[in-house]
Design a protein with these regions (language model features):
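Cell-envelope and extracellular/periplasmic
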Residues: 34-327
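Bacterial N-terminal signal peptides that target proteins for export
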Residues: 2-10
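Bacterial signal peptide processing site
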Residues: 25-27
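C-terminal motif of bacterial Sec signal peptides marking the signal peptidase cleavage site
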Residues: 20-23
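Bacterial N-terminal signal peptides
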Residues: 10-18
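Membrane-proximal, proline-rich intrinsically disordered regions
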Residues: 29-32
Length: 327
């Protein structure tokens, strides 16, 4: 197992990546909005193509996209998970899920599978010693579809906004365009390897960095545009019936003040516009951010059991989305 003991240094690095990335860039003030507007960012769009899969021979695979910021990246602490669950369960997560593969690029190549498709285990998070929602997703999906291959394409940018970074002026922004190249690169690889690969759902865990009053006021319109771009640009890879958008609400952490209620209300309102938009409240689900590390909690990220539960919830709604297609 690759996971090592957690050190305060790694935790600080992860926290800085996820919550302070935008604050570390040069900015200019905008008199019109009252916002401190970040300078444009440049993304690395070099996505390698190692040949890591056998010929698919027409095998049908469900493809799920996992997008967002640090709680999608994976900053829940593996060591605490080990202490909070049965040893046999932890061993199962550590050994991984051979039928659920992941290809990931996190924080502009800060952590990456280097274009390879790996089985999901506890080593696919922001850094060594952290895990993300893909673990809970794989747990649920491997049980629901024991005879099928599931593929997760995970692309995240910790600490960055929908308003300025995934989008820019309501149009496709730097992160979006880099993500799109990532998705197209590996969907084309799967198809070229003779897999019948189709995207059935997008799981979105984002919004914590949009909780100023100005950005929150624009979140509904931004998300409407964002999902429209996703469905249009990925339409050639879409599952029969289209692509579901499964949206997790953000926490009520102090880091999400003042406008976490407005962000979550925007997400909920968006979900009501189509049966293919699904929203769930992480607050109502009881997910927590205040317990770990013990004595000095990382208020920005889900505690270990909550990080696992976040993935379970995503997995359950993915299953619901396929059930609605009659599968």
């Amino acid at each position: 197992m690759k996971t090592k003991n957690i050190t305060s240094t790694i935790l600080i690095i992860c926290l800085c990546i996820s919550m302070c990335a935008v604050s570390c860039t040069d900015r200019t003030n905008s008199e019109e909005t009252g916002e401190i507007v970040p300078d444009p960012i440049t993304m690395n769009t070099d996505f390698p193509l190692p040949d890591s899969l056998p010929d698919g021979e027409g095998e049908r695979v469900k493809v799920i996209l996992l997008l967002g910021q640090s709680n999608a990246t994976g900053c829940s602490i593996t060591e605490y998970l080990k202490n909070n669950i049965e040893a046999s369960e932890f061993e199962r997560y550590s050994n991984g899920f051979p039928s659920v593969l992941i290809n990931y690029c996190l924080d502009d190549h800060n952590a990456t599978s280097n274009g390879e498709f790996w089985k999901v285990d506890l080593t696919c998070g922001a850094a060594n010693g952290f895990f993300g929602p893909e673990v809970g997703m794989a747990d649920v999906l491997s049980s629901a579809y024991p005879d099928e291959k599931i593929i997760i394409l995970k692309y995240t940018m910790s600490g960055y906004t929908l308003h300025y970074h995934w989008l820019s002026g309501g149009e496709r922004g730097a992160i979006y365009n880099a993500f799109l190249k990532f998705a197209e690169t590996y969907m084309n690889y799967l198809i070229g390897k003779n897999y019948d690969a189709k995207i059935g759902a997008i799981c979105w865990m984002q919004g914590e960095s949009d909780t100023t009053e100005f950005k929150a006021a624009h979140y509904y319109d931004n998300q409407t545009a964002f999902v429209s771009y996703l469905r249009s640009d990925l339409s050639k890879y879409a599952e029969n019936g289209g692509i579901y958008f499964i949206d997790a609400g953000i926490s009520n952490s102090p880091y999400c003040e003042p406008s976490y209620p407005e962000i979550n209300e925007a997400k909920k309102l968006f979900s009501e516009q189509s049966p293919m938009n699904i929203y769930f409240s992480t607050i109502d689900a009881g997910l927590t951010v205040h317990k770990e590390p013990e004595g000095d909690p990382d208020w920005g990220h889900y505690d270990s059991l909550s990080g696992l539960k976040l993935g379970h919830l995503f997995g359950q709604y993915i299953i619901q989305s396929y059930d609605s297609r009659g599968e």
